[in-house]
């Protein structure tokens, strides 16, 4: 009986260690714009590399758009994004993107996911909805969302019910 308990405890300890050993993504650990952990969001993380050799690691396309706005004037060399399924970095410009669907997006009101192959993107759309898109369409949609968000900053409309006459 004692051996059984020891075996169970070892099995539980090993299983917990395996779950905790989630493979960390490339540096930086956290998004430079929002602070979200990039390993946790490995399926949406991005790396933008500029022609001057500098780069930024972000949690999502939303924070890439923020980075580009802050770095305006810098020429982009490449964009990489985590494949939704494998979390491996792939070329964001050649990835198949899905906009929308029922899965909640990362840092954006409308979800945007990248896939290494069309079969995976089609399967995602079939299960979760959304539509296939190019990187340029996804980036334009993200920039539009950010512009709309900026436009509404400082306009906290609480109604007029508290006015006293």
What residue ranges belong to the model's regions?
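N-terminal export/membrane-targeting signals
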Residues: 1-20
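Intrinsically disordered, low-complexity terminal tails/loops enriched in metal-binding residues
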Residues: 18-165
